[in-house]
From Swiss-Prot:
This is Tyrosine aminotransferase. Its EC number is 2.6.1.5. PROSITE patterns: AA_TRANSFER_CLASS_1. It catalyses: L-tyrosine + 2-oxoglutarate = 3-(4-hydroxyphenyl)pyruvate + L-glutamate. The gene is tat. The lineage of its organism: Eukaryota, Amoebozoa, Evosea, Eumycetozoa, Dictyostelia. Pathway: Amino-acid degradation; L-phenylalanine degradation; acetoacetate and fumarate from L-phenylalanine: step 2/6.
């Protein structure tokens, strides 16, 4: 026996699922590559976390609710895997529309919107199936799919048409292995909000091919000016929709990890396919999301709570002013063309590399900018949009102004002579 043991060799390898788990944003933010200029303070406008600079914070009312419930010790145990009934009821009232009424049974509470996305993809697709996702788009869709050995097909967003979906390209990608269309509105990274008519056009494609829609609507409450958000589920009574939402962006608490899947089951299509039972089963894998945060949802999401509504309106106006500053300042930079944002907390900036002596692409632009000016951005290649970069404009005005002045100086330094 001892001889047999001595002849064996250790061979412990990472699983195929783990090897497929590649999130380019986290890889860049967590590990970096380029080093900032040690003589300048680093200004990071790279990650969609509104809490980084401390200028945007959840209202005290929400903190007080949470503290009160912590002290009560009523929510220290395991919640139901799909969420507390009171939390699900609150979400149902919050996301339902006059044409799409919901009850607590139509809500699955998840660990953040990313957890909700994982549930939605996991319940609709099997290994070898394919899902259609936007390009440019949020890399997590592909990362989540690949860990489940689900193939990803990217449908184009048309830059010259305000990043609307290329409907003909979308149609061309559909085959017998296509099981869902994922639509992100308002959009990360583009910062655009789709019109009602364009959403109806997308829904028509889904109806033609009998494909359910996963609607990532996490930024639904962050729209600017006259740009109105339309929940996709409010625009159809034929196409079944899994709508993704959460409190991370509206309430500035991404670390609280609270999201949801809202099930809009048209003609019992999901029920007949046991989709609801499947979501419940998948939710049981993590034994339910944060119990304490769930406990405050009835008051936090109450549509009649004017205190919360006024605070949310103030935050949105603040972000809108930051977006305007971004466009106003960076429009003056040599070789840069900002894309006007109609919502979210993101701005895409187009780079004309022909204007520079020694910058070939967005990767080089972002890398050299960090090394010389200590301003950290994400290159568009991360989102499948080369020769752009994304700015997160949540920082205080003084920090944004300083960062943009450095970017303008950088563009002048590298200007083609």
């Amino acid at each position: 026996m001892q001889d047999n043991v001595s002849q064996r060799k250790w061979n412990v390898e990472s699983s195929k699922s783990a090897n497929n788990a590649f999130n380019p944003i986290r890889r860049i933010v967590d590990k970096g590559g380029f080093k900032p200029n040690p003589n300048k303070s680093t200004i990071s406008l790279s990650i969609g976390d509104p809490c980084v600079f401390g200028n945007l914070n959840i209202l005290d009312y929400a903190n007080d609710l949470l503290i009160e419930n912590i002290k009560s010790s009523k929510f220290n145990g395991y919640p139901p895997s799909t969420g507390y009934e009171i939390a699900r009821e609150a979400v149902a009232k919050y996301v339902e529309t006059p044409t799409s009424k919901l009850t607590s049974k139509d809500i699955i509470v998840a660990s953040g919107a990313s957890g909700a996305i994982e549930l939605a993809i996991g319940v609709l697709l099997n290994e070898g199936d394919n899902i259609l996702v936007p390009k440019p788009g949020f890399p997590l869709y592909e990362c989540t799919s690949k860990t489940k050995f689900i193939n990803v097909k990217h449908y184009n967003l048309l830059e010259k048409q305000g990043f609307n979906v290329d409907l003909e390209h979308l149609r061309s990608l559909i085959d017998d292995k296509t099981k869902a269309i994922l639509v992100n509105n308002p959009s990360n990274p583009c910062g655009i909000v789709y019109s009602k008519q364009h959403l109806l056009d997308i829904i028509q494609v889904a109806r033609e091919y009998c494909l359910p829609i996963i609607a990532d609507e996490i930024y639904s409450d962050l729209t600017f000016g006259e740009h109105k958000f339309y929940p996709m589920a409010s625009l159809t009574d034929k196409v079944p929709i899994l709508s993704i939402g959460g409190i991370a962006k509206r309430f500035l608490v991404p670390g609280w990890r609270l999201g949801w899947v809202a099930i809009h089951d048209r003609d019992n299509i999901f029920s007949n396919g046991r989709i609801i039972e499947g979501l419940i089963s998948l939710s049981q894998v993590i034994l339910g999301p944060n119990s304490l945060v769930q406990s405050i949802l009835p008051k936090l999401l109450d549509p009649q709570n004017t205190q919360v509504k006024e605070w949310c309106s103030t935050i949105t106006k603040t972000l809108e002013s930051h977006s305007k500053l971004t466009v106003d300042m960076l429009s003056k930079a040599n070789g840069l063309k900002p894309v006007c944002s109609s919502g979210t907390m993101y701005q895409m900036i187009e780079i004309d590399c022909s204007k520079y002596e020694d910058i070939a692409d967005d990767n080089e632009f972002v890398g050299k900018l960090l090394e010389e000016q200590s301003v950290f951005l994400l290159q568009g290649t991360v989102f499948s949009l080369p020769n752009f970069f994304r700015i997160v404009f949540c920082a205080p005005i003084d920090k944004l102004t300083e960062a943009y002045e450095r970017i303008i100086e950088f563009c002048e330094t590298h200007k083609k002579k």
